[in-house]
UniProtKB/Swiss-Prot annotation:
Cross-referenced HAMAP family: RRF
Keyword Protein biosynthesis applies: yes
Name used for this protein in its record: Ribosome-recycling factor
Molecular functions (GO terms): ribosomal large subunit binding
Superkingdom in the source lineage: Bacteria
Compartments, as annotated in UniProt: Cytoplasm
Keyword Lipid biosynthesis in record: no
GO biological process assignments: cytoplasmic translational termination
InterPro entries, per database record: Ribosome_recyc_fac, Ribosome_recyc_fac_dom, RRF_sf
One of the record's GO cellular component terms: cytosol
Pfam families per the UniProt record, alphabetical: RRF
Amino acid sequence: MLNEIQQNSQNKMNKSINSLKNAFSKIRASRAHPSLLEQIHINYYGSMVPLSQVANISTEDSRTLKASPWEKDMVSVIEKAIMTSDLGLNPQTIGQVIRIHLPPLTQERRGELVKIIKDEAEKAKIAIRNIRRDANSDFKELLKEKEISKDEARKAEYDIQKITDEYIKKIEINLNKKEDSLLEI
């Protein structure tokens, strides 16, 4: 029972870390990467689909992405979706190829991005702590129902705290890596 609660908590903590990594991947550093456009959705025959399902997205160079739609009718729709996204990008269409040039980051914008990733990291830490709190309340409930002893409950709380500390450290490591990549010129 205790192992099940700990395992369940660890799985939830892994999901929080993966969610944080996903959020970090959408915040661009100095290099172009196709994942930058993952959050853009296109109206494709009445349904909203990710850009990657209607076009091939590739990196042309360190500052340029290239989107090649599979249907030529979609060129203007994709271009409009990229322009209206909150990414601040201006696509250029040449024939059926859309090129997206990424402007260099200013020091001010880098500072804003660092603030954003710190907020995301803090949200992840809060999620991890909430998972720990839920596990501890489950342990207390088991203790109250006399399914486990005080010693077992104390050990379980100690173990879940060690797991929590480990995941908080992972968040810090990911935050530091992302912060370094954003501040790199």
